[in-house]
A protein has these predicted regions:
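Acidic, mature catalytic/reactive cores of soluble proteins
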Residues: 1-266
Length: 266
């Protein structure tokens, strides 16, 4: 059996036993109970495989579940379940999934619904995850101080010092959650200060979203198209200003102390 044949034979469609996800879906793992829910950015890679194997309806159902969650919570949550948005979001790849489906099987009415959802997601990133320098950062949806302290005390994925103040615990958990939202939990890339960095990849994804919306509305709504085009150009200028080094390499930007990271991450 070839690898391709194995993949084709092992796609498995789930129905959410809790009833939260309204559409059947294909999760990132088959048998691990924790990862049989639909995770946000994992779904992009799953969908590329589904589309390649002609399973367009399964890929569309995955996206429909993400859109459902976005409309319910105001962001695409880390994973699709009733408490999925309490933690954070994940890298904004929904527009790439929509683009892939538009190419694989155009559906003008569905595309209108999907693009309306993308505009809503864009508002989330531009209001809840904007930094003072004008670029975007990762963050957390957890606002309750007691919850952050409790989560610090119970954290097991990496070793954390216990004899620290509650303020340190709160700031550490904010950054660890932001790191999780980046999809790279955990990484030395952000020096345990992920919420203080405007990431190259995050801002590149948002540039891609702005470019997609500019193009989509090009022959439908000139005003919207111009708005997203101007936002795209502004982002490109800010990324060049804050992220580009003398050799033309882009680095994550720590806006809290006006420093480019010394880590080559993108």
């Amino acid at each position: 059996m070839t690898v391709r044949e194995y993949i084709k034979n092992t796609w498995k469609v789930f129905t959410d036993p809790s009833g939260f996800a309204p559409y059947p879906y294909v999760p990132p793992c088959l048998d691990d109970g924790r990862f049989t829910v639909l995770y946000y950015w994992d779904t992009f890679f799953t969908n590329e495989g589904l589309i390649a194997d002609g399973r367009i309806n399964d890929a569309r159902n995955n996206v429909n579940n993400l859109i459902f969650s976005l409309n319910k919570f105001g962001c695409v949550p880390n994973c699709v379940w009733e408490r999925g948005a309490e933690y954070a979001s994940q890298p904004p790849l929904l527009y790439m999934m929509v683009k892939s489906l538009m190419k694989a099987e155009p559906d003008a009415e569905w595309e209108k619904t999907a693009v309306a959802a993308l505009e809503k997601e864009y508002v989330f990133w531009m209001t809840e995850r904007i930094s003072p320098c004008g670029l975007n950062r990762h963050g957390t949806n957890m606002k309750d101080r007691r919850t952050l302290i409790r989560d610090y005390d119970n954290y097991t994925r990496i070793k954390l010092p216990k004899n620290v103040s509650d303020d340190v615990k709160v700031q550490t958990m904010i950054s660890l959650t932001a790191e999780g939202e980046s999809g790279e939990d955990h990484t030395p890339r952000y020096h345990r200060r992920a919420a203080e960095y405007a990431g190259v990849d995050l801002n590149s994804h948002l540039y891609g979203l702005e470019s997609f919306l500019e193009e989509y509305f090009g022959d439908k709504d000139k005003e919207k198209s111009q708005k997203y085009g101007e936002a795209k150009n502004k982002r490109a200028a800010l990324m060049k200003k804050f992220m580009e080094d003398p050799d033309g390499v882009y680095h994550d930007y720590r806006y809290t102390d006006d420093q480019r990271s010394d880590v080559y991450a993108c």
